[in-house]
Amino acid sequence: MDLLFGSTNPGKLRELRRLVAGLPLRVVSPDDLGRPLPVVVEDGATFQANAEKKAVAWARWSGLHAVADDSGLCVDALGGAPGVHSARWSDLEPEGPASPVCELAGVAELELGPVAGRAARDERNNDKLLAALSGLPDPRRGARYEAVLALARPDGTLVGTVTGTCPGRIGHARRGDGGFGYDPLFVPAAELAAGEGARVRTMAELSSDEKDALSHRGEAFRKLLPMLAALARGA
């Protein structure tokens, strides 16, 4: 059975394909279909609302079961920013003091185009995050990754949604060449538990298997597996 994952982000596609490798499913991307995804304006109030809206729209468009992801980084010291604006945070004007960015989606988070353009935006986003937290000690650099996955049938019926969270802390400098987004700055809580004096690794320094075990998206994908297994069985 073909399953559309509504993303052109190669990192997200690799994660999902690794995690469903044992199921009789073929994860396809918009590139595999030879058609660009239709734009869905992400104007929902939460990650969940945006993920559900995309999954329903893309399932109807493709005629396939579809999975959509909405995810982001929420930093405690920034009142939850960048939150739903994580992908394009560096392109936005500074948020006002009353803007709970982790819950409000006032702009469309469109897919980010070529890999080179996405990497450049990641760099700008990380620069902005480092500047925003400049001078803050480790105890005030708490953060979490959040991911919501929504699954819809070809007729647009919503099957369900799942959520994954990865708590951690923002480092003081980039480390690691793996991952994408804020991974070079994000130190997962499991690494912090190593104890005083231990060298902790960022998400970008973990192997693929280690990241799958710890990440917000890995947790969400694992929660989604029973739904996907039922679909593969024809349930």
From Swiss-Prot:
List the cysteine pairs that form cystine: none
Xref: InterPro entries = dITP/XTP_pyrophosphatase, ITPase-like_fam, RdgB/HAM1
Where along the chain is substrate bound? 7-12, 71, 180-183, 211, 216-217
Record EC number: 3.6.1.66
What are the recorded Gene Ontology BP terms?
Answer: nucleotide metabolic process; purine nucleoside triphosphate catabolic process
Name its co-factor(s). Mg(2+)
- Keyword Metal-binding among record annotations: yes
Q: How does it assemble?
A: Homodimer.
Family, according to the entry, reads as follows: Belongs to the HAM1 NTPase family.
- Name of the featured protein: dITP/XTP pyrophosphatase
* Source organism of this protein record: Anaeromyxobacter dehalogenans (strain 2CP-C)
